[in-house]
């Protein structure tokens, strides 16, 4: 027989559940407030004690109400936080299973896609998904099997709250760790985010991609094109993350394509720029676009990235010489439509001139003594001190260091004498470039 104390506790539980069942929206909101305040941070045994071993009876009511109301656009934040009290409690595996058995994951993912639901409510949904993902590998797999990666990535791209977007990043980071079955799916989802219109989403995706890349160890072919396109951004924080990812990617098999792509960006497509320039000429109101053309922003960022890579790894600097990077940098220095392209290209060229005597010789010869002295005196501000004729000389340069490199014997074998022996991966992509040089000459 139950004791008088136990009977009283059961009576209180039944009364509480009856109050919930009979309450309207306002009364239920008050009940949830009191529940969260009284039980936040409690363990599962403590919740059971509070509810006389009947906590699951309240949880099932919460999940049922969630499923009945989430599509109506009703406020969900208190309801989701109350469910979170159960799911985040220590030793709460039973509650978690009960929530998942009634389709909890699918409900949380559907909440992310509904326009009528408030951003704050969606943030609470993301937090519950974090709790589920952090509960173990099989729960991460369940989220991914429920098309969760796509739903979560799309929400990250569309979200207007940076705080919420950062919570989404935490969730994606959790899904990439300890999830070998679906880590490639998360990786591809992050790559798919790069072209999105949200700078914050791009920044967070790039950050998480660096982690994902180190875990997976192989690259997806589309990553090069996607990362290079991000360089057209006007947001420096996004550009920074893109360059940091590029620094990582040169250690993988996409290095040749990445270097070739960066050098190609130094000379934007004439067809694209001519379309934009003709528009500028015909409409004086868009003259300011000259400084913000995506292709020119991309050009400046590429020049900066090339400088970062060259300073980081001398072998990479040499490989870019074989891609005629000096010619392309000087051409970018002649782009009077975009001063930052001139500035970044000039700073990067300065490093190549200091590093390779053969480059110094060709640059001096092409520039002429007067322009070269200006360049040496202040490479960063050269764009402010040159006239239109000097800019044309730079833009129309025909510098080709590649042939001289072969004649002088400057190669990875010579460079290893001064800078140490390259690893096997470096030898592989050096060989790749040598083969292309021979094919071009033939």
Swiss-Prot record:
**Cysteines paired by S-S bonds:** none
Return the Pfam families for the record. Answer: DUF5578
Tell me which domain of life the UniProt entry assigns to the organism this sequence originates from: Eukaryota
In terms of InterPro entries, this protein maps to: ARM-like, ARM-type_fold, DUF5578
Know the name of this protein? Armadillo-like helical domain containing protein 1
- Native organism is Bos taurus
In the UniProt record, the gene name given for this protein reads: ARMH1
């Amino acid at each position: 027989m139950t004791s008088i104390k136990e009977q009283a506790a059961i009576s209180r539980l039944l009364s509480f559940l009856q109050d919930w069942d009979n309450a309207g929206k306002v009364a239920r909101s008050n009940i949830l407030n009191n529940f969260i305040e009284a039980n936040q941070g409690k363990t599962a045994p403590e919740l059971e004690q509070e509810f006389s071993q009947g906590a699951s009876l309240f949880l099932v009511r919460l999940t049922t109400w969630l499923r009945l109301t989430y599509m109506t656009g009703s406020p969900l934040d208190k309801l989701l936080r109350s469910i979170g009290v159960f799911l985040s409690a220590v030793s709460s595996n039973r509650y978690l299973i009960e929530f998942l058995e009634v389709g909890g994951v699918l409900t949380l993912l559907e909440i992310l896609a509904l326009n009528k639901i408030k951003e704050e409510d969606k943030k609470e949904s993301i937090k519950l998904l974090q709790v589920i993902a952090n509960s173990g590998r099989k729960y991460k797999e369940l989220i991914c099997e429920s098309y969760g990666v796509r739903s979560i990535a799309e929400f990250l791209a569309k979200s207007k709250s940076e705080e919420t977007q950062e919570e989404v990043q935490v969730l994606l980071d959790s899904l990439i760790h300890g999830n070998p079955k679906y880590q490639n799916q998360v990786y591809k989802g992050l790559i798919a985010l790069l072209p999105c219109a949200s700078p914050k989403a791009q920044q967070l995706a790039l950050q998480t991609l660096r982690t994902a890349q180190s875990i997976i160890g192989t690259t997806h072919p589309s990553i090069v094109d996607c990362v290079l396109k991000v360089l057209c951004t006007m947001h420096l924080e996004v550009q920074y993350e893109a360059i940091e990812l590029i620094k990582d990617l040169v250690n993988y098999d996409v290095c040749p394509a990445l270097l070739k792509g960066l050098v190609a960006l130094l000379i934007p497509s004439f067809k694209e720029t001519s379309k934009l320039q003709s528009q500028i000429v015909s409409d004086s109101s868009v003259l300011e676009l000259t400084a913000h053309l995506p292709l020119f922003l991309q050009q400046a960022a590429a020049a900066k990235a090339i400088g970062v890579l060259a300073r980081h790894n001398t072998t990479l600097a040499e490989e870019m010489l074989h891609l005629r990077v000096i010619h392309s940098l000087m051409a970018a220095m002649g782009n009077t439509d975009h001063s930052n392209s001139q500035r970044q290209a000039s700073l990067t060229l300065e490093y190549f001139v200091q590093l390779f005597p053969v480059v110094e010789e060709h640059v001096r010869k092409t520039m002429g003594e007067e322009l070269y002295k200006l360049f040496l005196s202040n490479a960063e501000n050269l764009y402010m001190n040159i006239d239109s004729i000097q800019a044309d000389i730079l833009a129309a340069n025909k510098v080709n260091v590649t042939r001289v490199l072969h004649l002088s014997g400057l190669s990875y074998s010579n460079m290893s004498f001064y800078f140490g022996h390259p690893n096997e991966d470096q030898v592989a992509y050096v060989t790749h470039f040598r083969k292309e040089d021979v094919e071009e000459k033939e």
